[in-house]
Amino acid sequence: MFGAMELNKAAKAAPKDVKPLIGCEVYIARESMHQPHSKKNGNGYNHLTLIARNNEGYKNLIQLASSAYTEGFHFRPRIDKELLSKYADGINCLSGCLAGEINQLFKLDKDAEAEQLASDFRDMFGEDHFWLELQRNGIELQDKVNENMVRLAKRTGIPLVATNDIHYLRHEDCQAQD
């Protein structure tokens, strides 16, 4: 979100028609964003990717990001599903990387819970505004999760989207990420 204005200016200045996608990866608290997480339940949050599809969605992303920092910050800026539901209008949602909740449920062989959560997200964002992510990153667990995502898409009709978990632009920047 912090680079949205610069991205928009660069897209307008581009020689070809470039449509910027403004979005962010958010941390979703497993319980309330107002409760600190404890070591006994892991890190206490999951990842989710949100992309504004219109001006209302952009304003809602700003609200979610601001609330994550001002109300939900505990080691990381977090929101919860209650707040996400309140500000879901105008936003497209992707299921997230391996740290996404659906993927974590698949990792624990909780397929029925993963399917229910995917249906809940589809209901929250609207039928045409939630996608299940597939990634190919050389991680063996990712391949297992991808197989589960494909089966889930066939059962639920939720569409698939191919993405990747990008953390740096150039290979030489990898040291800063690591």
Predicted regions mapped to residue ranges:
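Phosphodiester-processing cores and adjacent nucleic acid-binding clamps
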Residues: 1-178
